[in-house]
Structure formats: structure tokens, C-alpha cells
Amino acid sequence: MSDRLVHLAANLEKVLGKRVQSIEIALGEVTVVVNADTYFESAMLMRDDPSLAFEQLIDLCGVDYQDFRDGAWNGQRFGVVSHLLSLEHNWRLRVRVFAPDDSYPLVASITPVWSSANWFEREAFDLYGIIFEGHEDLRRILTDYGFIGHPFRKDFPISGNVEMRYDPELKRVVYQPVTIEAREITPRIVREEQYGDPV
């Protein structure tokens, strides 16, 4: 384990204090899990404290942990994962926060802290339905405005709910319920005795 990573973890614990749920060092990376109610405050501290100085947000995404590892996950269903970069200290950090309510996933927007979070948060809202409180323009970014549901959720039907097609009589695009029939695919088992033997 690198001394730099241990030093970063110690700085995080010192600066964030009780805002931290856990800090883990694994596979050459530091991951910190922060409380949802102090997420925005923690982000401000990680950016502004000189011992951390995470000036840049590289990535932010939503995660649905509903079927994570076949029931081995006992935590909240929805999480937000961010990756930060400190140019001053040459550190990278993964930050996780979990939405406290699975039926209405809500976390604070960190767009005022790092403006690069803007479209990332819109994407997480569009695909997972995670609400970012305080985001000034939280609307769909990848799916159509009339789209029903959030397609990256584990409980979203694989075939979708509606399909879009061009209607030549109306001369426009129309939406209709999905016409795909569910079918079960059973693998074919080869029962020949000499199958695969060289001739």
C-alpha cells in the first residue's frame, strides 16, 4: 500500500470528520463514502481545503445496486459515484454517496462546486431517476422528453414500454405499446455421441 494513499486517506478523515461513512484503499485507489445529508458540504471541503485541493471533477455517474451480487448488497439501492482529481497533489479519489430513500432517490447537486457535474447529473437523472436537489436545469439529456421511466434501472423492462415508428399514412413518427412478444430461449444440447471427436 502506497504511503501517498495512506496520507490521502488520513487527510480525508481529518478534513471531513463525521461526514465520512467509510474510507477504503483498494487496488491502488482511495474510495470515500460520505453521508447524503453532508454531500454538498463534503464536496466544498474536498475542493477548498488546501490539504486535499480536488480542483477537478472528472466523472459522475449513477448506480442501481438492486441486484448487486445476487443479494449480497444490504445498502441503499441508488448511489452516485464521482471521480475527483487534485492537480496540486497529483491525487485521484472516488467519492460515493447513497440516496437515503429508494422510492425517491434524492442527493444534493454538486454543480455549484464543480460545473463539469452539470451534464453528468442530468445523465444520471435521465437514466436512473436520481434527483439532484439544487440543479438549475435537471431535465432529460439522452432520452426523448416523452420517454416513460428510466432505462438503466434494473427493474426497467428489457424491451421497453413503448416503441417509436414512422406511420406513412399520418406522415409522422408515432408512439405505440411495444409489440415484441416475450419468448424463452432454451439452449440446444448436442446429444451426438461422437460430437467433437476428430474424424
Swiss-Prot record:
Membrane-spanning parts: none
Recorded catalytic activity of this chain's protein: a quinone + NADH + 5 H(+)(in) = a quinol + NAD(+) + 4 H(+)(out)
Matches recorded under Gene3D superfamilies: NADH:ubiquinone oxidoreductase, 30kDa subunit
InterPro entries, per the entry: NADH_DH_suC, NADH_quin_OxRdtase_su_C/D-like, NADH_UbQ_OxRdtase_30kDa_su, NADH_UbQ_OxRdtase_CS
Keywords: Cell membrane, Membrane, NAD, Quinone, Translocase, Transport, Ubiquinone
Enzyme class, broadest EC rank: translocase
Pfam families, per the entry: Complex1_30kDa
Domain of life: Bacteria
Places the protein is found: Cell membrane
An example Gene Ontology molecular-function term: NADH dehydrogenase (ubiquinone) activity
GO terms for cellular component: plasma membrane
Lipoprotein in keyword set: no
UniProt EC number: 7.1.1.-
Mode of membrane association: Peripheral membrane protein
Function: NDH-1 shuttles electrons from NADH, via FMN and iron-sulfur (Fe-S) centers, to quinones in the respiratory chain. The immediate electron acceptor for the enzyme in this species is believed to be ubiquinone. Couples the redox reaction to proton translocation (for every two electrons transferred, four hydrogen ions are translocated across the cytoplasmic membrane), and thus conserves the redox energy in a proton gradient.
Oligomeric form and interacting partners: NDH-1 is composed of 14 different subunits. Subunits NuoB, C, D, E, F, and G constitute the peripheral sector of the complex.
UniProt similarity note: Belongs to the complex I 30 kDa subunit family.
Name the record gives this protein: NADH-quinone oxidoreductase subunit C
Organism: Polynucleobacter asymbioticus (strain DSM 18221 / CIP 109841 / QLW-P1DMWA-1)
